Amino acid sequence: MYMDIVSLAWAALMVVFTFSLSLVVWGRSGL
């Protein structure tokens, strides 16, 4: 159970990080 929570939290963190990074790149590109 503990590993499932850690894996879920890590996956969520990576999704948020990737989304924010792509959003910044998309904003800087002027689109």
Curated annotation (Swiss-Prot):
Protein's recorded name:
Cytochrome b6-f complex subunit 8
| Gene giving rise to this polypeptide | petN
GO biological process: one example: cytochrome complex assembly
The UniProt function text for this chain reads:
Component of the cytochrome b6-f complex, which mediates electron transfer between photosystem II (PSII) and photosystem I (PSI), cyclic electron flow around PSI, and state transitions.
Q: Which HAMAP family match?
A: Cytb6_f_PetN
Q: Which species does this protein come from? A: Cicer arietinum (Chickpea)
Q: Where are the transmembrane segments?
A: 5-25
User: What subunit structure does UniProt give?
Assistant: The 4 large subunits of the cytochrome b6-f complex are cytochrome b6, subunit IV (17 kDa polypeptide, PetD), cytochrome f and the Rieske protein, while the 4 small subunits are PetG, PetL, PetM and PetN. The complex functions as a dimer.
Query: Listed GO cellular component terms?
Result: chloroplast thylakoid membrane; cytochrome b6f complex
Where does the source fall among the domains of life? Eukaryota
User: Keywords of this protein's UniProt record, alphabetized?
Assistant: Chloroplast, Electron transport, Membrane, Photosynthesis, Plastid, Thylakoid, Transmembrane, Transmembrane helix, Transport
